Amino acid sequence: MHAVLRERLAAVGLSLPEVVAPVGAYVPAVQIGNLIYSSGQLPMVNGALAMTGKVGAGITPEQAKELAQVCALNALAAIGTLCNLDDVAQIVKVTGFVASAPGFTGQPTVVNGASELFGALFGDAGKHARSAVGVAELPLGAPVEVEVIVALR
């Protein structure tokens, strides 16, 4: 399952992670018709946050961009619990939340970590609508959270 996507990930030196266990009373993803909505995904690696803190105060925008990519991979893993990821017809919407220090306004650059990954993996089908939002705090002290909506063939 997910053979084509796994090949594309390997070509850019990445792999699909295990699904992150929810940290609350929710499921990783929900399907309605041909749309799948991921829950917000944190930059969890092997069950722990890769980093904590705020972007612009201890975490650089470059580090946060890499963390957004981790979030995007975790979102794909969550979505993949409900479908074969090779059946994704379109990345519809990406919403990125960035825990931002006062005065930090580079949220779009941070969320590009997710957007650029989807472009690399899905080509034109990776082009999506997007919001990049600065927030005061995120769950568990995470610097970035990403949620994704995909359409299936």
Name these PLM-found stretches:
Residues 1-153:
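Short, polar/acidic, helix-capping and beta-turn segments at strand->helix junctions
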